[in-house]
Every structure is written in C-alpha cells, then in structure tokens.
Amino acid sequence: CLLSRGLGDVYKRQIYFRANAEKKLKRTVHQWRPVIDYSEKDVWEVMKRNKVNPHPCYRAGWNRCSCAGCIFSTPELFAGFKELYPQEFEEMKHDEKALGFTLDNKCDLETYIEGAKPCLYKGDKEAIHSLITGIFTESQIFIDGQWKYPAGAFHGAEGGPC
C-alpha cells in the first residue's frame, strides 16, 4: 500500500475495509481512498475539470459536508444551521435543557453562536432548496455552464456540518 504523508499505517491509500471477512465468508473487501494525498485545492480542481456540481452544503457556504448539527461545528456553522433549520436548532436547544448538558462545555447553544456571522450563502437558491427538501437529482450532478468554486471552498476544516 502507498502511504500518505509519512504517517505510517495511519493513512494508507488502500486498507482492508471493516466488513472484510476472509475467513468466514471467503471474501476480501478493500477500502480505497484515492484522494487521501490531495490538498483541498487538488480536489476542487478535479471537480472543476470534470464539471462536477459540488454538494449543496459547499454551495450554501459550509466548509465541510457531514452531520448538520455536528457537535464540532463552529459558532458560524451553527448560526448557519439555525438560519437554515430553525426548528431543528430549537430542538437542539430543548435537548440541551432536557439533558442538562450543553454541546459546548462553557455555554448553551444560543450563547455559543451569539455575535457569529452565519456561514450561510443565500446566493445559490438551488443549493438552499436541496438542503431544505433533501432533493438532489441525477441531472444536477454535472454542470453544463461555467464551473465556479462554491461559497464554502477554502474556509478551513473546522467543524463538520451538513
């Protein structure tokens, strides 16, 4: 296996997948991570070259694409979450009270985002619609016209929304 960034066995390009079952099911399952050595710019350039439409999260201003209410989100990401999903944000606040435990060790969610500028970019109405409705069709995978970097590109790797 090719190793990544001199990190030894931690980040291999190809590893055995956790569902690997050579002995019991007589099958070998690999996990291939072809872009593990790519920089963020490298990934965006591949998408640009192939006119791949970025995930709506990136187009709506988020810097990462994972759980919308990720506990590792920054105040700006949670402020964007609140703006896009107000009911779910209220449910998270309710859960903090019900559990007697806050996502941040020092304050509740509302205090955590106080004064934060939401990451949400409202200029891509199609992306906002996709995030609210969950609808993203096959016809939206590629871009016909000019490709451009999404609003969430190059904003670091903190947090983990959408």
Regions found by a protein language model. Name each.
Residues 52, 73-162:
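Peripheral terminal appendages
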Residues 20-42, 50, 95, 99-100:
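Short, flexible loop segments at boundaries between secondary-structure elements
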Residues 36-91:
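Mid-to-C-terminal catalytic subdomains of enzymes
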Residues 9-26, 73, 85:
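Short, surface-exposed, charged loop/turn segments at secondary-structure junctions
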Residues 4, 61-64, 156:
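Processing junctions and N-termini across compartments
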Residues 2, 68-71, 120:
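Secreted/luminal cysteine- and crosslink-motif detector
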Residues 1-11:
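Single conserved hydrophobic/aromatic residue that forms the stacking wall/gate
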